Amino acid sequence: MYPAHLLVLLAVCVSLLGASAILPLPLNLVQFTYLIQCANKGSRASYHYADYGCYCGAGGSGTPVDELDRCCKIHDDCYGEAEKMGCYPKLTMYNYYCGTEGPYCSTKTDCQRYVCACDLQAAKCFARSPYNNKNYNIDTSKRCK
């Protein structure tokens, strides 16, 4: 074997070892996005909810700024309950359908049912809550105490 081949093989092995330490991405985020789109047909894109208020997006603290932000806090709390049940809500994949009357869950295990119900409840809550552009990308260090 040529020295260059050994170097390439070594580089691949080192890369794979490094990749094994990387945390997995939230797999059901895509499903949650589709549930939001199904519940909010013709409305704003789901990414508008990723940095809204004190609770929509990563983390959360303080008092929700409005009804929509309360939807996100309830969703966070629901995921917290799922974790207490031994579920991994950000990694749990589930089955759902987008019917003419909106999304609904159709899944088998307790964790899948619970996590899908959390996401479904949030998506429907988003659909009925007004969106205030002033609460998008707020300074959480000042407004979320």
Curated annotation (Swiss-Prot):
Gene Ontology cellular-component terms listed: extracellular region
CDD domains: PLA2c
UniProt GO BP: arachidonate secretion; lipid catabolic process; phospholipid metabolic process
Active-site positions on this chain: H75, D119
Leader sequence residues: 1-21
Cofactor: Ca(2+)
EC number, as in UniProt: 3.1.1.4
InterPro entries, sorted: PLipase_A2, PLipase_A2_Asp_AS, PLipase_A2_dom, PLipase_A2_dom_sf, PLipase_A2_His_AS
Reactions accelerated catalytically: a 1,2-diacyl-sn-glycero-3-phosphocholine + H2O = a 1-acyl-sn-glycero-3-phosphocholine + a fatty acid + H(+)
Pfam families attached to this UniProt entry: Phospholip_A2_1
Cystines in this chain: C38-C98, C54-C144, C56-C72, C71-C125, C78-C118, C87-C111, C105-C116
Residues reported to bind Ca(2+): Y55, G57, G59, D76
Transmembrane segments: none
Propeptide: 22-27
Manner of cofactor binding, per the entry note: Binds 1 Ca(2+) ion.
UniProt similarity note: Belongs to the phospholipase A2 family. Group I subfamily. D49 sub-subfamily.
PANTHER family: PHOSPHOLIPASE A2, PHOSPHOLIPASE A2 FAMILY MEMBER
Function (record text): PLA2 catalyzes the calcium-dependent hydrolysis of the 2-acyl groups in 3-sn-phosphoglycerides.
Protein name as annotated: Basic phospholipase A2 cL037
Originating organism: Laticauda semifasciata
